[in-house]
Amino acid sequence: MPKANNAVASRARRKRILKKAKGFWGSRGNILTVVKHAVDKAEQYAYRDRRAKKRTFRSLWIMRINAAARLNGTTYSKMVNAMSKKSIEIDRKTLAEIAVKDPAAFSQIVKAVIE
């Protein structure tokens, strides 16, 4: 009796892995053994960087708030401290957005916080 090797499932599995490696350079995109390692590593980087992205954006928001605060005669740390003392809760993302899109409104916030 001939050996059944379930070629349909094997081909589907290989296609699924090769599909994840679309756009990879050279043998990293078309040789299965190399593709497996490349896709594994890519998924590790993706997992790590989904978490790092949160930290990166927070630091970007802080930089933007600090730059806008310095234009208004204070610093980020003094402003955040004053906001916490007055229990004004505006998150960093929103503050950074206001600082970039509406500097006049940000100036009013700074004046209200630092009196």
Curated annotation (Swiss-Prot):
Binds directly to 23S ribosomal RNA and is necessary for the in vitro assembly process of the 50S ribosomal subunit. It is not involved in the protein synthesizing functions of that subunit. NCBIfam families: rplT_bact. This is Large ribosomal subunit protein bL20. Belongs to the bacterial ribosomal protein bL20 family. InterPro entries: Ribosomal_bL20 (IPR005813), RIBOSOMAL_L20_CS (IPR049946), Ribosomal_protein_bL20_C (IPR035566). It holds the Pfam family Ribosomal_L20. GO terms for biological process: ribosomal large subunit assembly; translation. GO terms for molecular function: rRNA binding; structural constituent of ribosome. It comes from the Bacteria. GO terms for cellular component: ribonucleoprotein complex; ribosome. Keywords: Ribonucleoprotein, Ribosomal protein, RNA-binding, rRNA-binding. It comes from Chlorobium phaeobacteroides (strain DSM 266 / SMG 266 / 2430).
